[in-house]
Structure formats: structure tokens, C-alpha cells
Amino acid sequence: GCDVDNVMGIDIETTGTDPARVYIIDVGFEYMNMISPRPADAPAGYQYEQGYYEAGDAYGQSRLAFGVPAENAALGNPLILDLTGIDVRTRSVAEAASSFRLFDEWPAAQIGLLQRLEQQPYVAHNARFEHSFFMLNVAGYAESYRAGKITIIDTLPMSRRWDEGSIPDDEHPHGNNTLDAYAKRQGALDASKSERHLGLEDTHIMLVAMKHHLGVLHAEGRGPWGAGGRPGNGGKRCGKRW
């Protein structure tokens, strides 16, 4: 929607793709205002793992790490290690000295995340992924979503519908709309770099890309400001309407 302003960006890393069978091991989130200025009292100068990322308008950065069961740790996960750099062999919750806990068995972590998700729209790239994991792993999320307390904004359809650089080809029939490609086209990620595949770092380039993209669309009278645009936050939400 053309009035969207304060949003919470979020990205999760997991040990697989089935939310009923795998584990959330990394959650990164931060906030950004799409219209109003960055809060003057928000700490500045946050340092991301990728030193060339600049915090810019982002604030409230948070990175949360979680563990896996002993059996999962013993098997390891080479695919996830290669993709994210996270070695689940070091994250067994059964180790006496382990500081890691299972996210889906940690009520306080779930409550804290849900409270944040309810306070403003949350943004994710291919938000269906995050939404599916939250539905099964965050107590109260499904009820809150059904009651209309959750609004989800997805940058994937923004890329598909409104990014003119998303050109269909043989490899990408609907255009290349990965976060990596979208962020590069919107100037949020240098062409020589790659998406990091860590929650907070990926959240950051997503929000930077989204804000730049909205600025372009506004200036050109397209997207939310075009003929089919609408006021308000937009996004996807549930809840009864009378």
C-alpha cells in the first residue's frame, strides 16, 4: 500500500524446507521506516557480519541463534553448512555446556517474536516460507494471524510485478526474483557480492532494496501509486471483515 511506513523485516535460516520436520536455527530481524525519518534516539552504526553493509535507515537489529537435537547434530547438515556457514554439529542442545535451545520448545522466544510481529507489518522475501514456519513453530501465531493481527508484506511479488529488471528467460520464466537478484537490481547489494544466507544480513539487503524500489515507484507513479494502487499498508492479512 502507498502508506506503508514502519516495518519489521525478518529472515530465518532452517535445517530444511518442511516446517513440520526441521528446525529454525537462525532468525534475523530489523526495522526500517519507508516514509518517516529514522528514529532519532535509535542507536546508529550497527556492524553486520558483512563489513561493507551500511546500516543506513535500519534500526533495532537483532540476531537469534538456536540449536538442534543431538541426533540432528550428530548427522550434520553439509548443505546448510555450505549455504549459511552454520555447522549444526556445534549446536546440539544436549551438550552440557551448550548455550543453544530449540526454538520450537522455547515459549519465551516464541512469545517475544510474536509480540514483535504483531506491532507493525512484517516483511520477508518469499514470505510464504517464514509464514509456514511461524504457523507451526510459534505458539499463538496462527490464532493471531486468523484474528487479523498479523500483516505480511512480501518483496517477492514486488520484484515480479514492479521490477522492470526482472526479465523472463529460459532459466527464469518469470524473471530472476531471488533476493540476491532483486537486491542487486535495487542497489542494495553490489554486483560482485552474493546474498549471505544469514537472517539479519539478508533482512537488511531486503529492506534497503524495498525502500529504494518504493521510492522509484512513487516517483514514477507506478505500483502502489499506480492505477491499481491502494491506500494503507497493503500486504496480506486475515481476519473477519464486515
Model feature map: region roles:
Residues 1-138, 146, 173-187, 191, ...:
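Conserved non-catalytic scaffold segment of RNase H-like nuclease domains
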Residues 136-141, 161, 165, 185, ...:
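Active-site catalytic microenvironments for nucleophilic, acid-base chemistry
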Residues 143-146, 154:
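A mobile, often basic/glycine-rich helix-loop segment
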Residues 150:
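A cross-family kinase active-site recognition segment
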Residues 153-174:
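Short alpha-helix plus adjacent loop in nuclease-associated cores
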Residues 185, 200-242:
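Acidic two-metal-ion nuclease catalytic site recognized across multiple nuclease folds
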